[in-house]
Amino acid sequence: MMWKLLLLFALLLTVLEPLLGHPVVQSAEMSFGRPVVVEEEQALNPEELSFSEQAYLSHDAAGFGYPSLISGDISSDGLRTAGFVPSQAVKEALLEKPLWSRFLGSRKQYHKRGSNTECFWKYCV
């Protein structure tokens, strides 16, 4: 009975391990406001921004590959230049060979070419 409890606890820790790695933030510290929309001609003072907006802009300036909020690169062209093309991703996912065929070793059946009788096993001359 005790080993079942230990096994259940170990399984629970294994499942919850990715969630335990994130810090828990007090709800009073969290800001639920929408992001500030900044026009290109409008100048920003760092004192006017909240802490979360400063963190967002600093991550963007660090070069994480996201479209810039200040420069206004949020468009489908910006996403395409960043390397994500939705239609291409769907085509690649649909045209990709099924993974199970690689692991299970399923292959196409060999078919003879034409009416050649000079064949040895798979090789025809």
Swiss-Prot record:
Residues 1-21 form the signal peptide. Disulfide bonds join C119-C124. Residues 109-111 form a propeptide. It comes from the Eukaryota. Keywords: Cleavage on pair of basic residues, Disulfide bond, Hormone, Secreted, Signal. InterPro entries: Urotensin_II. The keyword Secreted applies. GO terms for molecular function: hormone activity. GO terms for cellular component: extracellular region. PROSITE patterns: UROTENSIN_II (PS00984). It is found in: Secreted. GO terms for biological process: blood vessel diameter maintenance; regulation of blood pressure. Urotensin is found in the teleost caudal neurosecretory system. It has a suggested role in osmoregulation and as a corticotropin-releasing factor. Belongs to the urotensin-2 family. This is Prepro-urotensin II-beta. It comes from Danio rerio. The lineage of its organism: Eukaryota, Metazoa, Chordata, Craniata, Vertebrata.
